[in-house]
Amino acid sequence: MVECIFCAIVEGRAPAEVVFEDGETLAFMDINPANPGHTLVIPKQHVRNIYDLDDEAAAAVMRATVRVARAIKKALQPDGMNLVQSNERAGGQEIFHFHMHIIPRWYGDGLRLARPSEVRRTMAIKEAAAKIRGEIAKEQD
């Protein structure tokens, strides 16, 4: 089994520029930043992706993300910010430990988030919404 680099960072066995830590989460600088200040927020417990993330860990990661995003806003004064979270290879996930990217943005920074040039629709919006609502309703039963 390949070792999880993020778990090694949490355990102090791999280096990282840590900017925030609490009992449940860790935030550190991305080693391949899309822009200056690009930061990752992770749960300390190994969780592969959003599908495996429990509600408590999700809340902890979001609390830490908000706190770090506010600090980035004050420290670096970006014009905006992207929060990015990818799941599985098809979704662009490269490290299989849940993580949130906080990417500061400036006008003219040239950074583009991938998006097809024309909208590709395999099902109508209403049909997709109905299927999603159906799955959410199943969870509440």
What are these regions (language model features)?
Residues 1-141:
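HIT superfamily nucleotide-processing domains
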